[in-house]
Design a protein with these regions (language model features):
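Hot-dog-fold acyl-thioester-processing enzymes
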Residues: 1-78, 142-249, 313
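HotDog/MaoC-like acyl-thioester-processing domains
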Residues: 1-7, 85, 89-172, 254-313
């Protein structure tokens, strides 16, 4: 990472952090909440959500480099985000953030226009990079949103259980969530928890005069909410006992604002598989995610990469 900053924004992962993240996003995966699960699976302890450290990168930038995320700019919005998880994060780990300017967009498919692109690394108390990625800020137009993807009816009946990585695209879970109406508590709770005091989220007078005409929900929160919806479906099926579903990384695009009172549904499906070159007994599966509002408009889309047990070659 060229010309990176000194570490900023020190924050220790606590039980309360994990509980609050789960409550705000609906990600109640056993590995984060069962104190016996991680040690029994050889994880070395109870691990935090990957997206806890990923999301916190935006909070740290908001606190220590606010121009990188447009804090206080009525015309700017976070257009895209990418994250890669390199190491497990445990209760008691101490995060800090290093960031640098770049001229590469965080993800593909962003609308043309002037951007502020930032790469980041989240570093633990041992100097190890646990999380890395990029965020793109823009004052340009919104990209054209795709149509909501078709998600066929799915049932695990008839699927070859356990479902290996090789079988995910054909047999893996896909669907549409029950939906969630965005509340005042969601927006304020996330902004305060993650350290994102953007007036676009919290200040009605500022937001009413801004580009979207009202306060919006933090896009990092809406993506985490969609991830929680998808993950519940994924973890409802049997997968191989060799290895476990490891979260490798994500990316997302902001396509339209989400307001308090909007109802959003998550659509998701597996879209690709490739065998791991370094661990041939494992495969990498990509899942597509869309968040769709009550008017049928896709407001955010993204990809999730997971590593899972594959069939022997």
């Amino acid at each position: 990472m060229p010309d990176r900053s000194e570490p900023v924004g020190h924050r220790t992962v606590t039980d309360a952090s994990i509980l609050a993240f789960g409550a705000l996003t609906g990600d109640y995966a056993q590995m984060h909440f069962d104190l016996d699960f991680g040690p029994a699976q050889g994880m070395g302890g109870t691990i935090a959500h990957g997206l806890l450290s990923g999301a916190w990168s935006l909070g740290a930038l908001a606190q220590h480099a606010p121009d990188r995320v447009g804090l206080g700019d009525p015309d700017a919005y976070i257009a895209g985000y990418r994250v890669k998880f390199g190491r497990m994060v445990y209760i008691g780990d101490l995060f800090s953030l290093r960031w640098a300017d770049t001229n590469e967009p965080a993800t593909e498919g962003l609308a043309p226009g002037s951007r502020v692109d930032t790469t980041f690394e989240v570093v633990n108390q041992r100097g190890e990079v646990t999380t890395s990625g990029a965020v793109s800020l823009t004052r340009g137009s919104l990209p054209n949103a795709p149509e909501p993807m078709e998600v066929e009816a799915w049932s695990k009946d008839g699927a070859p259980l356990p479902i290996h990585a090789d079988d995910m695209v054909e047999y893996g879970p896909r669907g549409r969530s029950l939906g969630r109406t965005v509340s005042e508590a969601d927006v304020v709770g996330w902004a305060n928890f993650n350290g994102e005091p953007s007036p676009a989220y919290l200040n009605a007078e500022f937001a009413n005069a801004g580009r979207f005409g009202a306060r919006i929900a933090p896009p990092m929160w809406t993506f985490c909410l969609g991830f929680g919806d998808y993950l519940r479906d994924l973890l409802s099926v049997s997968m191989p006992s060799t290895g476990f579903a490891g979260h490798l990384g994500d990316e997302w695009r902001f396509l339209a604002p989400v307001f308090v009172g909007d109802t959003i549904h998550t659509r998701h499906r597996p879209v690709s598989f490739k065998r791991s070159a370094s661990r041939p007994q494992m495969g990498i599966v990509e899942f597509a995610i869309q968040l769709v509002n009550q008017r049928g408009k896709v407001v955010q889309d993204g990809r999730v990469a997971m590593m899972m047990g594959a069939r022997p070659e």
